[in-house]
Curated annotation (Swiss-Prot):
Residues that hold substrate according to the record: S240, Q262, H265, H330, D363, E417, H422
Keywords (A to Z) from UniProt: Amino-acid biosynthesis, Histidine biosynthesis, Metal-binding, NAD, Oxidoreductase, Zinc
Reaction equation(s) it catalyzes: L-histidinol + 2 NAD(+) + H2O = L-histidine + 2 NADH + 3 H(+)
Active-site residues per Swiss-Prot or TrEMBL entry: E329 (proton acceptor), H330 (proton acceptor)
Gene: hisD
GO BP, sorted A to Z: L-histidine biosynthetic process
PROSITE patterns cross-referenced by the UniProt entry: HISOL_DEHYDROGENASE
GO MF annotation list: histidinol dehydrogenase activity; NAD binding; zinc ion binding
Protein name as catalogued: Histidinol dehydrogenase
Organism in which the protein naturally occurs: Yersinia pestis
Length: 443
């Protein structure tokens, strides 16, 4: 097996500004015009033809004739019976930790009096209906069911719909059962996103769609989120990525394993090592080659390593600065006192601190969510959490005294904006209150 290109050490300080910018560029994910047009056609057909279009696309893209789009309860029970106890116990432990972490994210009611007689509240309500897309293929992702289904249940979403390409893996069906998801449909690709966004005879329309997917799924989510008749989505999606910051005390084998755990996701994944220690970087390159030989998805990982980087910096501070500029989906701090620099980390989806916090823990069972912003969106987007399955509402209630105390402020600002109806809504009430007060005084 030929070695990868992931064995060339790059000295950051010796690179020009343009070269540094190029080093932090990600593999292109822009949908081609062909994909954009194809997805648009799929969306329109599903909206117009419903289940008929869904069956046609399943035959064309998944090479499966789907008679019943919805998976029955008996089919889910049969899938559960086929799974080993080890897998079931592992999923149960993962769900427990995910529940603990996401339950802790419940937002308290905000209830304050901003001035006498003016009461303001912030309350939350669950999104009524959500759709979860779970990719299929050679590597089913039941962990994503747990990461999406658990917060949806905790939030109290009344309807949770799950779509996955046929045939749906037993692990995915069991994970759905574990999360209390009863509406499961064997549809994949852009057509599944269309079904959840618009609804069909079998698939209910939802308000918001979650979950990862290929370029067609990603483009479908983008398009439905921009249509008035579509649905909201969780966040923009891109290929998986990890950045590791390592000092001279780091363990090369651990670093290599974490880098490869992301590289095996797909050929467009990207992994980066930043270290002030050239010896560590070189040792990691050797470890990567040795561990690659043991991986079932070695060919995929090798492709990902072609656009990955081993970067040697001047010092740890430079590593931090580069990481914040890149904004990785996963950030691993393989340094001696990671807690001393966490306050300097501004842009990352999820951070893993120390030798004993592998990225795999967050992917599966530590309790944090593995649905994270990628492609630099960490500068503006957060990791998925309970807040994504609820919406906030504000409430205000003014007493007569409260309105009188605030009236002149509102009237002045409304007049400044030349919105006289706004001003009048206050003035009429103030007049009514003053008239009532005058009448009482006369009595």
């Amino acid at each position: 097996m030929q070695p990868t290109n992931f064995n060339t050490l790059i000295n950051w300080q010796q690179c020009s500004e343009e070269q540094q910018k190029a080093l932090l560029s990600r593999p292109a994910i822009n949908a081609s015009e062909r994909i954009t047009a194809a997805v648009s056609d799929i969306l329109d057909r599903v909206k117009a033809e419903g289940d008929s279009a869904l069956r046609d696309f399943s035959q064309r893209f998944d090479h499966v004739q789907v008679a019943d789009i919805r998976i029955t309860a008996s089919e889910i029970a049969a899938a559960s019976a086929r799974l080993s106890d080890d897998v079931k116990h592992a999923m149960a432990q993962a769900v427990r930790n995910i529940e603990i972490f996401h339950n802790a994210q419940k937002m308290p009611v905000v209830d304050v009096e901003t001035q006498p007689g003016v009461r303001c509240q912030q309350i939350t309500r669950p999104i009524a209906s959500v759709g979860l897309y779970i990719p299929g293929g050679s590597a089913p992702l039941p962990s994503t069911v747990l990461m999406l289904g658990t917060p949806a249940r905790i939030a109290g979403c009344q309807r949770v719909v799950l779509c996955s390409p046929p045939p749906i893996a037993d692990e995915i069906l069991y994970a759905a059962q574990l999360c209390g998801i009863q509406e499961v449909f064997q549809i994949g690709g852009a057509q599944a996103i269309a079904a959840m966004a618009f609804g069909s005879e079998s698939v209910p329309k939802v308000h918001k769609i979650f979950g990862p997917g290929n370029a067609y799924v990603t483009e479908a989510k983008r398009q439905v989120s921009q249509r008035l008749d579509g649905a909201a989505i969780d966040m923009p999606a891109g290929p998986s990525e990890v950045l590791v910051i390592a000092d001279s005390g780091a363990t090369p084998a651990f670093i290599a394993a974490d880098l490869l755990s992301q590289a095996e996701h797909g050929p467009d994944s990207q992994v980066i090592l930043l270290t002030p220690d050239a010896a560590i970087a070189q040792a990691v390159a050797v470890e990567v080659e040795q561990q690659l030989a043991l991986l079932s998805r070695a060919d995929i990982a090798r492709q990902a390593l072609e656009s990955s980087r081993l970067i040697v910096t001047n010092d740890l501070q430079q590593c931090i600065d580069i990481s914040n500029a890149y904004g990785p989906e996963h950030l691993i701090l393989q340094i001696r006192q990671p807690e001393e620099i966490i306050d300097q980390i501004d842009n990352a989806g999820s951070v893993f601190m120390g030798d004993w916090s592998p990225e795999s823990a967050g992917d599966y069972a530590s309790g944090t969510n593995h649905v994270l912003p990628t492609y630099g969106y960490t500068s503006t987007y957060s990791s998925l959490g309970l807040a994504d399955f609820v919406k906030r509402m504000t409430v205000q209630q003014l007493t007569p005294q409260g309105l009188l105390g605030l009236a002149s402020t509102i009237e002045t600002l409304a007049q400044a904006e030349q919105l006289t109806a706004h001003k009048n809504a206050v003035t009429l009430r103030v007049t009514a209150l003053n008239n009532a007060l005058t009448a009482v005084n006369k009595e």
